[in-house]
Structures are given as structure tokens and as C-alpha cells.
């Protein structure tokens, strides 16, 4: 009997560690997806470096209580799967949201973003943001624009002076 309890304590500790380490966690209801669809979803998530696990709701609730995250108890009803991302905050929301568009059985229920509980609406809003790489390229474009414009202005002045001098 005590070995079963110890095993459950280890699982609760594992779940708590995953929630602590993850930058973004998305909870979904996967009821209605067949094996092929689940395999496809797991593959997409794995390629993005996201861990996708199914845990018992009671163990997940205990892990959340252990780390002090409140407000997710109502989410953990029925069959749930949890996507943990330790690197990219946007990736799990984006991948799961895109998958849910083509597979109506998948329902995003909520999540945790950088230690704060997030509603379904907040996860959907996060999914609409560009990826980290996209945001960095936008930032780089914004930073390069003044330099490029300055270089073009200097070139135009130089060309004009060259025309006047010739």
C-alpha cells in the first residue's frame, strides 16, 4: 500500500516540477480525437520541443496546490492533456489552436503563462501572436529602418552634389 502512495507522491512532484519549469502550459480536452489524430498532434508538439502528457486530474490538482497555483480546479474535469513548453511561450498555444481549428474535438481549456493562470481567451490571444523568431525579425526591421533611411538620404545628397559638380 505504501509503495502505491510513494509512487503517487513522485508523480505529483513530477507534475509540480513540470509546472514550475515551464514558461507556458496549455490544458486541453482531447475527448473525441482518435489515435491517428493524437499521434499527429504529439508529433507537431514534439518537433517544437513541447512535452504533451496526460495525468490524473486529482494528481494534477494536488501538484497545483503544492506550488500555489489556484484557479485551475474547474479546468481539470474530464479527460485532459497538458502541453508543457520550457522555451517558447507562444508555441504551445499556437500549435494547439491551429490543430483545434481543423479538429473540432480538441478544446483548449486554459493554462499557465509564466507562472500566472490564463483563461481560454488569453491562450487564444497568445496563439494569435507571432512566434519569438517572428517578433525578433520585426524588431530587427524596426531597428534597421532608421539606419537604412539615413544611408539612402546620404547617398541621395552625394548623388545630388555629384550631379551639380559635373
Curated annotation (Swiss-Prot):
Matching CDD domains: Ribosomal_L10
UniProt keyword Ribosomal protein, yes or no: yes
Annotated keywords: Ribonucleoprotein, Ribosomal protein, RNA-binding, rRNA-binding
Domain of life the protein comes from: Bacteria
Function description: Forms part of the ribosomal stalk, playing a central role in the interaction of the ribosome with GTP-bound translation factors.
Subunit structure: Part of the ribosomal stalk of the 50S ribosomal subunit. The N-terminus interacts with L11 and the large rRNA to form the base of the stalk. The C-terminus forms an elongated spine to which L12 dimers bind in a sequential fashion forming a multimeric L10(L12)X complex.
Protein name (Swiss-Prot/TrEMBL): Large ribosomal subunit protein uL10
Native source species: Geobacillus thermodenitrificans (strain NG80-2)
UniProt lineage: Bacteria, Bacillati, Bacillota, Bacilli, Bacillales
Amino acid at each position: 500500500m505504501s509503495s502505491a502512495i510513494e509512487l503517487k507522491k513522485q508523480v505529483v512532484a513530477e507534475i509540480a516540477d513540470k509546472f514550475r519549469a515551464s514558461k507556458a502550459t496549455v490544458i486541453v480536452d482531447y475527448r473525441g480525437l482518435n489515435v491517428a489524430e493524437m499521434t499527429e498532434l504529439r508529433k507537431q508538439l514534439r518537433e517544437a520541443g513541447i512535452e504533451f502528457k496526460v495525468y490524473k486530474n486529482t494528481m494534477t490538482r494536488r501538484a497545483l496546490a503544492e506550488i500555489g497555483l489556484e484557479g485551475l480546479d474547474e479546468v481539470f474535469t474530464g479527460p485532459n492533456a497538458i502541453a508543457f513548453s520550457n522555451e517558447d511561450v507562444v508555441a504551445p498555444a499556437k500549435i494547439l489552436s491551429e490543430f483545434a481549428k481543423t479538429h473540432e474535438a480538441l478544446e483548449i481549456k486554459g493554462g499557465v503563462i509564466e507562472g500566472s493562470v490564463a483563461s481560454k481567451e488569453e491562450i487564444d490571444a497568445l496563439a494569435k501572436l507571432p512566434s519569438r523568431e517572428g517578433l525578433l525579425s520585426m524588431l530587427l526591421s524596426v531597428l534597421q529602418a532608421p539606419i537604412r533611411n539615413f544611408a539612402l538620404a546620404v547617398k541621395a545628397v552625394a548623388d545630388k552634389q555629384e550631379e551639380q559638380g559635373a
